[in-house]
Amino acid sequence: MRHRMKRHRIGRYGSHRKATLRNLSREIVEHGSIITTTPKAKAVQIFFEKLMTKAVKAKKADKKEREVALRREIFKALGDRRLVNKLVDEIAPKYLDRQGGYTAIYKVGPRRGDGAEMSLIKLVIEE
């Protein structure tokens, strides 16, 4: 029975899944959007939304200690100081008044080689 099994496993064991989510999140921070399979897009959306929430909280933090702690948590997930700075200093200020929903998934059709359903996941930026 699969009661209460909410985790998106995406066909990988734990450390491989963690690495995949980390790499996809890094690409979203670096490029703003990526095209990947739909199950991976749904899994990385959950992971990335939590990172964005931490980045927004770090930007809103009134104490320097709280901001540093949140930046360290983001660094633990991304593993690159340059990307942490970009996420907190450049991307997060655009979402200070937003209560979540930082990304959107758009289906783009099947992949040519094997027919896997592909999706575009991108940051939602309001003008």
From Swiss-Prot:
UniProt-listed Gene3D superfamilies: Ribosomal protein L17
Domain of life per record: Bacteria
Alphabetically ordered keywords of this record: Ribonucleoprotein, Ribosomal protein
Membrane-spanning intervals of the chain: none
GO cellular component: cytosolic large ribosomal subunit
Keyword Nucleotide-binding in annotation: no
InterPro entries in the cross-refs: Ribosomal_bL17, Ribosomal_bL17_sf
Keyword Membrane: no
BP term (GO), one: translation
One Gene Ontology MF term: structural constituent of ribosome
Family statement: Belongs to the bacterial ribosomal protein bL17 family.
Subunit field text: Part of the 50S ribosomal subunit. Contacts protein L32.
Name used for this protein in its record: Large ribosomal subunit protein bL17
Natural source organism: Thermosipho africanus (strain TCF52B)
